Amino acid sequence: MLSLRRSIWIAACKRVSSFRTTIPIKSLHTNSQPVLSLRNVKFRPYSTIPLLQSLVPTCNSCGITLQKTDPDRPGFYREPGTGQKLVRKENLVASNAYNGLDDDDLKLLLNSSGEEKDISLFKQRNEPSPKVAPQSIQCIRCREAQFRSEYSQDEFPIESLDAIMTSLPPDAKLVYVISAADFPMSLDSRVFSYRSALEILFVITKCDLLFPTLNLANKYGLPFFQDYFYRKHGVSGENVVLTSGKIDWNIPTLLKNGKIRDNSYLIGSVNSGKSTLLKSMLSVSNKLAAKKQHLSSRERVKLEKEQDRLINSGASTPSDIRALRRKNEQEKNRTGPGASYMPGYTRGTIPYDVDGITMHDVPGFGENVDSNEFASLFSYLQPSQMKQLSKGVPIHKYGTYKSPFETIKGGQCYTVGGIFYMVPPPGTMVQARNCINHKAHIFSNVDKAKASLEAVANEDENGAHAGLRNVFIMPGSALKKLVPRYIPAFYGAIDLVVAGAGHVNLTPTGAPTPTDEPWIVWVPQGVRIWVRQPITRYITRTLAGRDAKGNPLRKELWKQKSVTHVERYTGKTPFYTRLSANPDNTMATKDNRYPAWYE
């Protein structure tokens, strides 16, 4: 019986194999309808949808439709050529010398061990081979930005929120990417007029700037962000995820738990980390798929050697960690969309296949883009300065109560690169902890600060004020656009937040005294600056002001005897507010810390 079944099975296999070999492949494509199935593709790593690319070629870096007729129009590109592969001069000389030898002399030269070698293979290896054309095509703008760091502000337009949201299909699954570096400035509530907050997945990126480890991010950071979105927008905690596209925090969890659904669109403000997040998901998806495949003997030996080296060296040395991160960054640069610190880098919607799920990278939107007076912080800066600010600084190192600080006296002017000029009222003392990636400076008054920037802008590099050149990153033209803004009354510490750059923690010291003078912040027109409650109050352990028995302590004894705790966000007081155009005479107290704040 078994032999009969086996013979029937063998005969069936032969018929199937003969059927496959007799029908030409061309007839299969012509007689059957083509089917685009993403889930049935066997390990197609980080590729855009090939059918769409063949019909309408787009830049794989920014997503714009390509054209090769007009160099002055957006999307211009040059077709890749198939030239000869470049060969080192030394290798070329050696190749010519080997080719000049006859077979007997070449055997005598190469066959010193007595083994027979294939001479044709050796000659073929030394001959230049044709260069393989790249699979992806980039526009000239992206290539200049990637390989030459050449940028033009006109080629990086920023779309409005209305233009982005109206271009999305009605059945799109939205993933709202929000930066943790300037939270909640990158969260625009106008999105909820197009889609309910309950239908959106919120992904908080750049969390490595807030926490030193992933465990602390999940332990302290996740409860705060879940509380915030639930109190403000009624969002369930399951729809809030903390990530870091730079070091792949929570990316495997995001992919495995089914939080990312098919036909998802990554939306968010400019420089919120959408493209970096997508590159991270593509890279992690590739690694997860590679683990499922069988390793070759060479790959297995290489992996075992790396594991042995890490085990013998402690596996946690800073050099090993840096080397691993550099390797991951190099792999990410070869995958997915282009990511840049330049706002407006992505210009079109780009579809990607992430483990059988279609995801779309969407251009970032700005605020008040349709206004005739639209400007932002990055419109004042050079590309190198944008890169510096966008990197950010670790808040867990520079923004806590243990971090070093500078003391500002009332009437003095505190500035970070000329982005803003903050003047506290007379009679106050302020501790400032800078969490912006540029050195702060304190001037005697605001007039001295303005005069210094004007002098630096009008002099050459060796002028009398050359020592102040590194103090400012804003150009001298920003002085004409400075407008005074006022911080609403507050009690205790606050964060002065700059959109796209970071924040400065301000902690007044001493007994609060009534004053008629407001807190003034001079801001260039278009630069968005808010104030918020200290975010470290809700994501790190801070001083509670009580001893171990629960007794309240005097302020000067806090650091010596106070216990630490993490506050939970309740939403009873405003978390942030915008700067006011008029001074505020409201008096803040311990029981009413933010009397004039509004969200």
Curated annotation (Swiss-Prot):
Residues 322-334 have a biased composition (Basic and acidic residues). It comes from the Eukaryota. It is found in: Mitochondrion. Residues 312-342 are annotated as: Disordered. One of its GO terms (cellular component) is mitochondrion. Residues 158-368 form the CP-type G domain. Keywords: Mitochondrion, Transit peptide. May be involved in the mitochondrial lipid metabolism. PANTHER family: GENETIC INTERACTOR OF PROHIBITINS 3, MITOCHONDRIAL. This is Genetic interactor of prohibitins 3, mitochondrial.
